Amino acid sequence: MVYLRHHRRDKEDSRERAVNRSYITGVKLTSEHMVDVMRAISKRVGVQIIDYSVYPDTESEPWRMKVFIEFDGEISDRYDLAAIFDEELSRVNEEHGHMLRIGETSPSVVYVLHRNASKELREENAKKKISDNQVKVIRYINSQSLLRDYMKRVKKAYGEGA
């Protein structure tokens, strides 16, 4: 289970904030929630998803999710991926929809990554001499440096403030 929290240098502050943030937002996501959401998005837009990652943007008030998706093809401009993501996540996790309705969570932002972005990120991690068992798909972005690495690979953004 992924508890949405903000990564901080001070470990005690981080733990306290993580516990408080998860109760404040009420949104606890499982990997199953995200797999269901990604399948639904893929079906709605008619393009397969290669990979995805999420970042809980707690610097935004109220907090929001930044979602990075790599598709196996082009997405039509008629789709608002941010709205689709929030609709589908609200369907599988009612708390997300509730928090959106009462203003405790801002609408999500979805970033479409350029082709092969996920592969590039894994290769960069391998070059950093991370052990082989740690070079894996990153589902939860937990640092500003990793967020910057993802932002460098954005092809298009959807959502308010994107």
Report the location of each language-model feature:
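AMP-binding adenylation
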Residues: 1-162
